[in-house]
Curated annotation (Swiss-Prot):
The gene is secA. Its EC number is 7.4.2.8. Zn(2+) binds at residues 897, 899, 908-909. This is Protein translocase subunit SecA. It catalyses: ATP + H2O + cellular proteinSide 1 = ADP + phosphate + cellular proteinSide 2.
Length: 913
């Protein structure tokens, strides 16, 4: 109540911002006559004038009105397009580091030129981030005349470019590119062996197009650069054969396993919300029996024996592949290869692979070639990458529903920009049916009715499978249609260009040509661009034909958007609706749902459908009721809330890794910048040797407790020196713990200096630097794997009444500290034993190391919630802490590691103990 009174008195935050922006727009408009009077040369000279004023101490905000007015006039002269006032308001929001929500067709691309130009005047570079290569190239080409007229350079950053081309693209004042490529370039820059190989400048200012898609939808899938692991296994194929024999256990929500009646019991349960599968007690027994039968386990062994624990990785990967990932929904199979379909856009993602063995399990399921498993070399989430920029902003047509998350995670405020013309699209209420068959019958009838009156339709589906199902229904009804999904995305531009023609029926997955407008009557520009050397008479004839089509479509009601199911996010539904009603055009939208749709089946209570049946609702009866609409919206809010919690949780864990990543990358950068690290090496040697001595000569201990033979042996093996420490102690009674430390360190340093004196100093410095880089890269790679293992199992700490997030922070810090100690010790020891090398041998070694690096693969990880907190909380209440009982003998340091790597325990997971 009080909030409403305050809003009425002072207006909403959005209204107050718009009011402030409108005053600045008035100042920009007032400058228009003055700027219009300038010659081309004088207009171009404004850029140098602005740069000089910046050097003289003026701020960007002081330059803003005049700079924006200059860009508007340049746009008129080069493109024939004049920025609307609402586009300028959008530009002001972007310059202020906010998200501008601008409706589809309102000209976001042109609106971004003003803040891009203004911020590029600093000379630090501006990145304009798009969701795909096509849009990056198109927007750069389209807006380039404005920037180049004003003396600024434009670069395009897309996959497949040579490093020299990328360096040129990043050196440009304004760089267009995809979110993936910007992120991968950042990771690659932190894997180079020479500063000249880096391509990015310090990250200054980014404008993210379709910001909701990049910062929300893709926030759960971190970017990963990986190389092939040393070995792979045919276990995926063998275990794949077992899975179809397993039976799903039928359970009601909240029911415990022991409460399930015998006839409903099975081998596994599914958590579709979190996309996880779990074996039941019966399932463990079934799998064990099948494993023993196939000779993968010995009779009497358990899946959880130390020797078999790695098998669970393959079992769970195969179980998820069979029960939660479907062909033509989550992936397609093309040329004997499994290609992921982006669930948010419907586009194919060639080259991307799911992690944790899931991709190999899907390949085994489909009979495709199983590619080798990968090992992560570098990784970062979009949350942490984009937070590296000094200033960040974004634009989209749909961000308001996610405003809280964008503010909380990124500190980005959403400003809803008014439309240039009033929006007159009619959003009709949902049509809900009991069954999917009844829903599709109603859809066909609706399409037929609108198609016959010449109204174009865009039918939105959630998956390739659903789009092909709708296509079959329409084909059966003899309704001509086009289908746009990941399988035929090559024809996307042509299909979208014709989707606004009278009576056109276009079926599209979520991709729906996002970033391109559906023009009523068809896209005249696209039509003309396909034809060369047209006579003026022919051009006028085609324009007249288009006008007739355009008028006919408007008379029929404009574009009608028909959704075949609700997405789990209201924002995606709004994106689909937004294809219609652009720039004041007429249009309409409506969703057709059934109680068998995934959203309602998983998230809306089952009792709703039971109640409808009890009330006598028939299959083909349509249900329209505010209560149903509220239930659907509530289900969507639940999913949005759950997905936000997952993203927040993943960010909380990734922030830990991010702090460590910054330390490693900073050390690496400093290494590359420095030619002589001999002082650093000396400090590292002193610290590493001192710590090693302390393990044999404990601090503040009696001499009887010292292990001198062990210390001599360790120094001999690791540093290649035979130091008679026992004799020193016999001859010199004044030696104590502190002086012994100093004498050993001095002897090891003296031996190194003697070796150094015989070598070429330049070669020695290069050896030190190269070796440190190699050790840093190797141990960071191993550390990423250890962190991943830790993250996957950390939720189990909840059963011991411990906070998993706190435990993860504590243990990951310990792992990181141990890693740094190992790097220092190995560096000191290896340098001590290293043979003298010439400068040419060092260069040859560097070349060999770089050539031996695995072929890199670029992909997104498939990350899910670690475990719902509610489940852990329940487990905390139900399970009392049990005393630890070792089921297997303790693994010796020189025995094979039980993880199956083939290494000794002390060289594998024993390192982490």
């Amino acid at each position: 109540m009080l909030g409403n009174i305050i809003k009425k008195a002072f207006g909403t935050r959005n209204e107050r911002l718009l009011k402030g922006y409108s005053k600045i727009v008035s100042r920009i408009n007032a400058l228009e006559p003055e700027i219009q009077a300038l010659s081309d040369a004088d207009l171009r000279a404004k850029t140098d004038e602005f740069k000089k004023r910046l050097v003289d101490g003026e701020g960007l905000d002081a330059l803003l009105p005049e700079a924006f007015a200059v860009v508007r006039e340049t746009s008129v002269r080069t493109l024939g397009l004049r920025h609307f006032d609402v586009q300028i308001i959008g530009g002001l929001a972007l310059h202020g580091g906010k998200i501008a929500e601008m409706r589809t067709g309102e000209g976001k691309t042109l609106g971004a030129t003003m803040p891009a130009y203004l911020n590029a005047l600093t000379g630090k570079g501006v990145h304009i981030v798009t969701v795909n290569d096509y849009l990056a190239k198109r927007d750069a080409e389209w807006m380039k005349p404005i920037y180049e007229f004003l003396g600024l350079t434009v670069g395009v950053n897309v996959p497949g470019m040579e490093p020299v081309e990328k360096q040129a693209a990043y050196a440009a004042d304004i760089t267009y590119g995809t979110n993936n490529e910007f992120g991968f370039d950042y990771l690659r820059d932190n894997m180079v062996f020479d500063l000249d190989q880096r391509v990015q400048r310090p990250l200054h200012y980014a404008i993210i197009d379709e910001v909701d898609s990049i910062l929300i939808d893709e926030a759960r899938t971190p970017l990963i650069i990986s190389g092939q692991a040393e070995e792979s296994s045919d276990l995926y194929v063998k275990i794949n054969k077992f899975i179809p024999q397993l039976k799903l256990q039928k359970m009601e929500e909240g029911q415990k396993e022991e409460e399930v009646p015998p006839e409903n019991r099975g081998d596994y349960t599914l958590d579709e919300k979190n996309r996880q599968a779990y074996l039941t007690e019966q399932g463990h027994r079934t799998i064990e029996a099948l494993m023993i039968k196939q000779g993968l386990m010995q009779a009497g062994e358990s899946l959880y024996d130390v020797s078999n624990i790695s098998l669970m990785h393959y079992v769970y990967a195969a179980l998820r592949a069979h029960t939660l990932f479907y062909r033509d929904v989550h992936y397609i199979v093309k040329n004997n290869e499994v290609i992921i379909v982006d669930e948010h856009t419907g586009r194919l993602m060639p080259g991307r692979r799911w992690s944790d063995g899931l991709h190999q399990a899907v390949e085994a399921k489909e009979g495709a070639t199983i590619q080798l498993e990968n090992q992560t070399l570098a990784t970062i989430t979009f949350q942490n990458y984009f937070r590296l920029y000094e200033k960040l902003s974004g634009m989209t047509a749909t961000a308001d529903t996610e405003a809280f998350e964008l503010q909380k995670i990124y500190g980005l405020e959403v400003v809803v920009i008014p439309t240039n013309r009033p929006m007159i699209r009619r959003d009709e209420s949902d049509q809900v049916y009991l069954t999917a068959d009844a829903k599709f019958d109603a859809i066909v009838n609706e399409v037929k009715k609108r198609h016959e009156k010449g109204q174009p339709l865009l039918i939105g589906t959630a998956s390739i499978e659903a789009s092909e199902l709708v296509a079959r229904f329409l084909k059966k009804a003899n309704i001509k249609h086009e289908i746009l999904n990941a399988k035929n995305h090559e024809r996307e531009a042509k299909i979208i260009a014709e989707a606004g023609r009278p009576g056109a029926v276009t079926i599209a997955t979520n991709m729906a040509g996002r970033g391109t407008d559906i023009v009523l009557g068809g896209n005249l520009e696209a039509e003309m661009s396909e034809l060369d050397n047209l006579a003026e008479e022919e051009i006028q004839k085609r324009k007249a034909d288009w006008q007739k089509r355009h008028d006919a479509v408007i008379a029929a009601g404009g574009l009608h958007v028909l959704g075949t199911e609700r997405h789990e996010s209201r924002r995606i539904d709004n994106q689909l609706r937004g294809r219609s009603g652009r720039q004041g055009d007429p249009g309409s939208s409506q969703f057709y749902l059934s109680m068998e749709d995934n959203l309602l089946r998983i998230f809306a209570a089952e009792r709703m459908s039971n109640m409808m049946r009890r009330l006598g609702v028939k299959e083909d009866d349509v249900i329209e009721h505010p209560w149903i609409t509220r239930a659907i919206e509530k289900a969507q809010r639940r999913v949005e809330g759950m997905n936000f919690d997952i993203r927040k949780q993943l960010l909380e864990y990734d922030d830990v890794a991010n702090d460590q990543r910054k330390v490693i990358y900073q050390q690496r950068f400093q290494l590359l910048q420095t030619d002589d690290i001999s002082e650093t090496i000396e400090a590292i040697r002193e610290e590493a040797v001192s710590e090693m001595i302390s393990s044999f000569v404990p601090p503040q201990s009696l001499e009887e407790e010292w292990d001198i033979p062990g210390l001599e042996k360790q120094i001999r093996e690791d540093f290649g020196l035979a130091l008679p420490i026992a004799q020193w102690l016999e001859k010199d009674e004044t030696l104590h713990e502190e002086t012994l430390h100093k004498r050993i360190i001095d002897e090891i340093t003296k031996a190194y200096k003697a070796k150094e004196a015989k070598a070429d100093p330049k070669a020695m410095r290069e050896v030190e630097k190269t070796l440190m880089l190699q050790l840093l890269d190797h141990h960071w790679k191993e550390h990423l794997a250890a962190m991943d293992h830790l993250r996957q199992g950390i939720h189990l700490r909840g059963y011991a009444q411990k906070n998993p997030a706190q435990e993860y922070k504590r243990e990951s810090f310990e792992l990181f500290t141990q890693m740094l100690k190992r790097i220092k010790y190995e560096l000191a020891a290896t340098l001590s034993k290293l043979e003298i090398a010439t400068e040419e041998q060092v260069a040859q070694q560097q070349r060999l190391y770089q050539q031996s690096a695995p072929e890199l693969q670029y992909h997104h990880a498939e990350m899910t919630a670690l475990q719902p907190e509610k489940e852990v909380a329940v487990a905390e209440q139900e399970e009392a802490t049990q005393p630890f009982v070792r089921s297997q003998p303790k693994v010796g340091r020189n025995e094979s590691c039980p993880c199956g790597s083939g290494k000794k325990y002390k060289q594998c997971h024993g390192k982490l103990s």
